[in-house]
């Protein structure tokens, strides 16, 4: 698998882990709160663990000075997911910041 694909998947898994943590904080049915929290935190750990393993393979191939800023994709994924899944409001300035992050990632990615 391409190192760049691994990097994107590592970022997506990290984002998924964050989203599972958010879901663990959401209300659940009475009497099922503990199961709800354990399920979502377990999923978070699974996603974050798999993301870390992919991240280690990325670091074997790409200098950390290039790879680490690419994790800024997490801000993009989390913003899109919060907006799309939980209908969280996103201000114009926030969207502008997301756009600038994407531009920065493209600039870094094409400099390798």
From Swiss-Prot:
<dbReference type="Pfam" id="PF00892">
    <property type="entry name" value="EamA"/>
</dbReference>
<dbReference type="InterPro" id="IPR000390">
    <property type="entry name" value="Small_drug/metabolite_transptr"/>
</dbReference>
<keyword id="KW-0813">Transport</keyword>
<comment type="similarity">
    <text>Belongs to the ArnE family.</text>
</comment>
<keyword id="KW-0444">Lipid biosynthesis</keyword>
<feature type="transmembrane region" description="Helical">
    <location>
        <begin position="37"/>
        <end position="57"/>
    </location>
</feature>
<feature type="domain" description="EamA">
    <location>
        <begin position="35"/>
        <end position="110"/>
    </location>
</feature>
<keyword id="KW-0441">Lipid A biosynthesis</keyword>
<keyword id="KW-0472">Membrane</keyword>
<dbReference type="GO" id="GO:0009245">
    <property type="term" value="P:lipid A biosynthetic process"/>
</dbReference>
<feature type="transmembrane region" description="Helical">
    <location>
        <begin position="66"/>
        <end position="86"/>
    </location>
</feature>
<keyword id="KW-0443">Lipid metabolism</keyword>
<protein>
    <recommendedName>
        <fullName>Probable 4-amino-4-deoxy-L-arabinose-phosphoundecaprenol flippase subunit ArnE</fullName>
    </recommendedName>
</protein>
<keyword id="KW-0812">Transmembrane</keyword>
<dbReference type="InterPro" id="IPR000620">
    <property type="entry name" value="EamA_dom"/>
</dbReference>
<comment type="pathway">
    <text>Bacterial outer membrane biogenesis; lipopolysaccharide biosynthesis.</text>
</comment>
<dbReference type="GO" id="GO:1901505">
    <property type="term" value="F:carbohydrate derivative transmembrane transporter activity"/>
</dbReference>
<dbReference type="InterPro" id="IPR022883">
    <property type="entry name" value="Flippase_ArnE"/>
</dbReference>
<keyword id="KW-1133">Transmembrane helix</keyword>
<keyword id="KW-0997">Cell inner membrane</keyword>
<comment type="function">
    <text>Translocates 4-amino-4-deoxy-L-arabinose-phosphoundecaprenol (alpha-L-Ara4N-phosphoundecaprenol) from the cytoplasmic to the periplasmic side of the inner membrane.</text>
</comment>
<feature type="transmembrane region" description="Helical">
    <location>
        <begin position="89"/>
        <end position="109"/>
    </location>
</feature>
<keyword id="KW-0448">Lipopolysaccharide biosynthesis</keyword>
<comment type="subunit">
    <text>Heterodimer of ArnE and ArnF.</text>
</comment>
<dbReference type="GO" id="GO:0005886">
    <property type="term" value="C:plasma membrane"/>
</dbReference>
<keyword id="KW-1003">Cell membrane</keyword>
<dbReference type="GO" id="GO:0009103">
    <property type="term" value="P:lipopolysaccharide biosynthetic process"/>
</dbReference>
């Amino acid at each position: 698998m391409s190192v760049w694909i691994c990097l994107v998947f590592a970022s997506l898994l990290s984002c998924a882990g964050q989203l599972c943590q958010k879901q663990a904080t959401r209300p659940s049915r009475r009497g099922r709160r503990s199961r709800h929290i354990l399920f979502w935190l377990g999923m978070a750990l699974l996603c974050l663990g798999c993301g870390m393993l992919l991240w280690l393979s990325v670091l074997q191939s790409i200098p950390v000075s290039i790879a680490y800023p690419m994790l800024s994709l997490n801000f993009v994924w989390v913003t899109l997911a919060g907006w799309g899944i939980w209908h969280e409001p996103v201000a114009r300035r926030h969207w502008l910041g997301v756009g600038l992050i994407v531009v920065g990632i493209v600039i870094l990615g094409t400099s390798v």
